[in-house]
Amino acid sequence: MIVRNIDEIIGTENETKAKTWTSRRMLLRKDKMGFSFHETIIYAGTETHIHYQNHLEAVYCVAGDGEIETIKDGKVYPIKDGTMYALNENDEHYLRGGKEDMRLICVFNPAVVGPETHDEEGVYPLLDDNGKRIK
């Protein structure tokens, strides 16, 4: 059984930060669950371009507000506490923080290794178990 508290993740190598977000990776590939599980904070008033070409993601908002815009068709969906969205088609999108930080619970398949951040195209690279880029 795996039991972890968020306080054990904050400030460690399993907490990854970028200009517009912080992600606390609670389950990783090394845990061999077949997915990774993250708590991600999207900062208020920010916009992040994301295009997961190598991963599928499901997201559940537990606090805060914001919106997601799909680039292909320009549709905008509000996000608030209780909203779930799934990027089942590797949807390229903008994720925007609203008036307050948005706290999201995220599941990725395949599981991330840990240090992944979005590249210039909004993509998480595929990494091997040592953190080296495969794709």
How would you label these PLM feature ranges?
Residues M1-F35, T117-K135:
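A short, N-terminal "cap"/entry segment at the start of jelly-roll beta-barrel domains
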Residues D31-M33, D73, E100-D101:
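Short strand-connecting beta-turns/loops that link adjacent beta-strands
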Residues F37-Q53:
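Conserved short histidine dyad/triad with adjacent acidic residue
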Residues T48-I50, I68-E69, L87, E92-K99:
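Short beta-strand His + acidic residue motifs that chelate non-heme Fe in jelly-roll/DSBH
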Residues N54-G66:
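Glycine- and acidic-residue-biased ligand/ion/polar-headgroup-sensing regions
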Residues A58, A86, E100-E116:
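A short hydrophobic beta-strand segment most commonly corresponding to one strand
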Residues D73-E89:
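Short acidic-glycine-tyrosine-enriched beta hairpin
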